[in-house]
């Protein structure tokens, strides 16, 4: 089979992993699209995206239009005569004229098993909801938000130790493999799109810092899911002793207890156990303001008085 001439569109590191897989394949990446350089770091200097940096290191032309709605940008893309456009976490909307420009259209790598978790935060929402598996979907793009026909799906189990950070790494390996398999299938004319069932679809909303505040009136299992979903960002937290305390790692005990939600059942070298609406949450790695995340055993060496049995972590109790 003749190698495909590919336009790649993406911006963050997750996308760069997919671009690298294409560069290592027999296919030809003829151009790269990435979002305009953004101010980053303390000096707020303009910074190129990981995708742009990778493309430039391989002498691939990079295009950074602020929008693909402009006629000039659309005409420029058409002159590239691509067979297909691969889109991974690009961040710009593709109008219909762009979707129709490459011979095989535009395909997208999405970090969930569609139609579940369409939208911006599929990896995090799978953890947040307590899903037992996630995966990658390669889909033919249309004008909707992750609504296109599914070309290929892969899955992997979500383990108890998984966080958004670890799932991100796993999908950053699985995604490029699925992408190459889908490209080979499309190139051979053997891959047929499967329409999504709208009745099975739901939406993965972006995370917010406010959402990461731990609510002791939820179940311990739900809080455990949130802590894993919000690691590495925005990181679950609670307000206590006029401080914002972040929780990086926890486990939970589903057994009922008689303690009030938010009160400390016990604190030892293994964890700080806090009562919730259902069961108890065992805090294992936490972070005090302007400090590094530490195991609870190290925190208790200097702050045992904060976490004595019977104290309440509810904001009004510590003010």
From Swiss-Prot:
Q: Which domain of life is it from?
A: Bacteria
Q: Which reaction does it catalyse?
A: L-methionyl-tRNA(fMet) + (6R)-10-formyltetrahydrofolate = N-formyl-L-methionyl-tRNA(fMet) + (6S)-5,6,7,8-tetrahydrofolate + H(+)
GO CC aspect terms: cytosol
Q: What's a Pfam family this protein contains? A: Formyl_trans_N
InterPro entries assigned: Fmt, Formyl_trans_C, Formyl_trans_C_sf, Formyl_transf_N, Formyl_transf_N_sf, Formyl_transferase-like_C_sf, Met-tRNA-FMT_C, Met-tRNA-FMT_N
Residue positions binding (6S)-5,6,7,8-tetrahydrofolate: 112-115
Question: What EC number(s) does its UniProt record assign?
Answer: 2.1.2.9
CDD domains membership? FMT_core_Met-tRNA-FMT_N, Met_tRNA_FMT_C
Keywords for this entry?
Protein biosynthesis, Transferase
Q: Which SUPFAM superfamilies match?
A: FMT C-terminal domain-like, Formyltransferase
Coiled-coil residues are: none
What GO molecular function terms would the record report? Answer: methionyl-tRNA formyltransferase activity
Q: Which residues, if any, are the signal sequence?
A: none
What HAMAP family does this protein map onto?
Formyl_trans
The UniProt entry's sequence similarity note says:
Belongs to the Fmt family.
Q: What function does the entry list?
A: Attaches a formyl group to the free amino group of methionyl-tRNA(fMet). The formyl group appears to play a dual role in the initiator identity of N-formylmethionyl-tRNA by promoting its recognition by IF2 and preventing the misappropriation of this tRNA by the elongation apparatus.
Task: Output this protein's name.
Answer: Methionyl-tRNA formyltransferase
Query: From which source organism is this entry?
Result: Shewanella denitrificans (strain OS217 / ATCC BAA-1090 / DSM 15013)
Q: What is the lineage of its organism?
A: Bacteria, Pseudomonadati, Pseudomonadota, Gammaproteobacteria, Alteromonadales
Query: Which gene produces this protein?
Result: fmt
């Amino acid at each position: 089979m003749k190698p495909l001439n590919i336009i790649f569109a993406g911006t963050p590191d997750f996308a760069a992993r997919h671009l690298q897989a294409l560069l290592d394949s027999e296919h030809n990446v003829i151009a790269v699209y990435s979002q305009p350089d953004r101010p980053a770091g303390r000096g707020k200097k303009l910074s190129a995206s990981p995708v742009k940096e990778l493309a430039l290191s391989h002498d691939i032309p990079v295009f950074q239009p602020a929008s693909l709605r402009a006629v000039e940008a659309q005409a420029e893309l058409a002159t590239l005569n691509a067979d297909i456009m691969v889109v991974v976490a690009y961040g710009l909307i593709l109008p219909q004229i762009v979707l129709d420009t490459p011979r095989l259209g535009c395909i997208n790598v999405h970090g969930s098993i569609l139609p579940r978790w369409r939208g911006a935060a599929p990896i995090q929402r799978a953890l947040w909801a307590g899903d037992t598996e996630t995966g990658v979907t390669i889909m033919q793009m249309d004008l909707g938000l992750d609504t296109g026909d599914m070309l290929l799906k892969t899955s992997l189990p979500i383990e108890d130790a998984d966080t958004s950070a670890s799932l991100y790494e796993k999908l950053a390996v699985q995604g490029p493999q699925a992408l190459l398999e889908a490209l080979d299938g499309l190139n051979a004319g053997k891959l047929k799109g499967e329409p999504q069932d709208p009745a099975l679809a739901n939406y993965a909303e972006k995370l917010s810092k406010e959402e990461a505040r731990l609510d002791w009136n939820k179940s311990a299992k739900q809080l455990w899911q949130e802590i894993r979903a919000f690691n590495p960002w925005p990181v679950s937290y609670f307000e206590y002793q006029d401080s914002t305390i972040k929780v990086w790692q926890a486990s939970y005990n589903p057994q009922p207890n008689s303690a009030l939600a938010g009160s400390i059942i016990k604190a030892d070298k293994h964890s700080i156990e806090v009562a919730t609406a259902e069961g108890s949450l065992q805090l294992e790695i936490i972070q005090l303001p302007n400090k590094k995340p530490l195991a609870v055993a190290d925190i208790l060496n200097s702050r045992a008085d904060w976490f004595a049995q019977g104290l309440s972590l509810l904001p009004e109790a510590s003010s």
